């Protein structure tokens, strides 16, 4: 690839990435503002309102931090020092962990809400909001502890002269870890991913089974009230199911790209493509939630 082609490719990736970030920031800002206005107007909150509002706030902050880091990838300037590099990268990774934790807990919460009264999960409905909040806090603190090694391994490297450094941005890079530390960190991350994504898969499978039962029951009964109720539950649950499926697929694809980049190819272009993939979920999710809000849809149609 000649220099002109390389610059053209770099420019296209930059424009695409910043467009993605801009769309994601707009969508999450709108969704967060909607939930804030809804809260202050005294509307009766749904059990899912808190995690959805929290998720939009997390994604908003994550995309803002990603935009700042991206300026150091696509735009040449004087660079950052060690403190700025450590702070931004650690904050970004922590927000990504929060996104995973909140998404997983949202899936579990929706499964609890959908459970019939005769099911054991229905017992958690009354305290589900409090329990989910505590679980999110616990998992977030745990993940931030796992990611604390970044405060040591991230460093400012204006002039990279060693191939062992892993590219993060023009000013920041990741110092190589010892084999033992890398193994411990990788194991902890894998356990975290398996646990949280496993919760999503279990809760998603549970909801699919319940929806199937609702559908069969609605077909057997002639009453309209049950059909309407089942339809409302279907709409809410299908939104979560779609997001969970999309999130799991993006997580798997992100892991594949990340591993291939670490093992085979490490350059600014491949990294730029990687960070574009990482933010697809944060960009798309607010619009999925917005499309299910009747108040917003009615206003937009009017």
Curated annotation (Swiss-Prot):
It is found in: Cell membrane. Residues 38-49, 115-131, 215-238, 291-302 are cytoplasmic. It comes from the Eukaryota. Residues 1-16, 71-91, 153-193, 260-269 are extracellular. Glycans are attached at residue 159. Disulfide bonds join 85-172. Keywords: Cell membrane, Disulfide bond, G-protein coupled receptor, Glycoprotein, Membrane, Pheromone response, Receptor, Transducer, Transmembrane, Transmembrane helix. The chain crosses the membrane at residues 17-37, 50-70, 92-114, 132-152, 194-214, 239-259, 270-290. GO terms for biological process: response to pheromone; sensory perception of chemical stimulus. Disruption phenotype: Mice lacking all but one V1ra and V1rb gene (12% of the V1r repertoire) show a lack of chemosensory response to a subset of known pheromonal ligands and changes in maternal aggression as well as male reproductive behavior. It is a multi-pass membrane protein. GO terms for molecular function: pheromone receptor activity. One of its GO terms (cellular component) is plasma membrane. Belongs to the G-protein coupled receptor 1 family. Putative pheromone receptor implicated in the regulation of social and reproductive behavior. This is Vomeronasal type-1 receptor 48. It comes from Mus musculus (Mouse). The gene is Vmn1r48.
């Amino acid at each position: 690839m000649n220099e002109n082609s390389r610059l053209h490719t770099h420019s296209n990736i930059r424009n695409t990435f910043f467009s993605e970030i801009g769309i994601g920031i707009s969508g999450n800002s709108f969704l967060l503002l909607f939930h804030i206005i809804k809260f202050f107007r005294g509307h009766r909150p749904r059990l899912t309102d808190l995690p959805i509002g929290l998720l939009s706030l997390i994604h908003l902050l994550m995309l803002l931090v990603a935009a700042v880091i991206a300026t150091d990838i696509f735009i040449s300037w004087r660079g950052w020092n060690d403190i700025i590099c450590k702070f931004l990268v650690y904050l970004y990774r922590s927000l990504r962990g929060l996104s995973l934790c909140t998404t997983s807990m949202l899936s579990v919460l929706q499964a609890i809400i959908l459970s019939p009264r005769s099911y054991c999960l229905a017992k958690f409905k009354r305290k589900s909001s409090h329990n989910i909040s505590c679980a999110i806090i616990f998992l977030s603190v745990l993940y931030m502890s796992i990611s604390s090694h970044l405060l040591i391994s991230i460093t400012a490297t204006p002039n990279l002269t060693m191939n062992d450094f892993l590219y993060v941005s023009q000013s920041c890079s990741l110092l190589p870890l010892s084999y033992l530390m890398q193994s411990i960190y990788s194991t902890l991350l894998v356990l975290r991913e398996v646990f949280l994504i496993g919760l999503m898969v279990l809760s998603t499978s549970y909801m699919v089974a319940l929806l199937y039962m609702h559908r069969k029951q609605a077909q057997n009964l002639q009453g309209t009230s049950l059909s309407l109720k089942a339809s409302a539950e279907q709409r809410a649950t299908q939104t979560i199911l779609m997001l969970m499926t999309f999130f799991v697929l993006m997580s798997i694809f992100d892991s594949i790209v990340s591993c291939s980049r670490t093992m085979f190819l490490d350059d600014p272009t491949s990294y730029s493509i990687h960070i574009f993939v990482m933010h697809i979920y944060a960009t798309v999710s607010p619009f999925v939630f917005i499309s299910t809000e009747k108040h917003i849809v009615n206003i937009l149609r009017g």
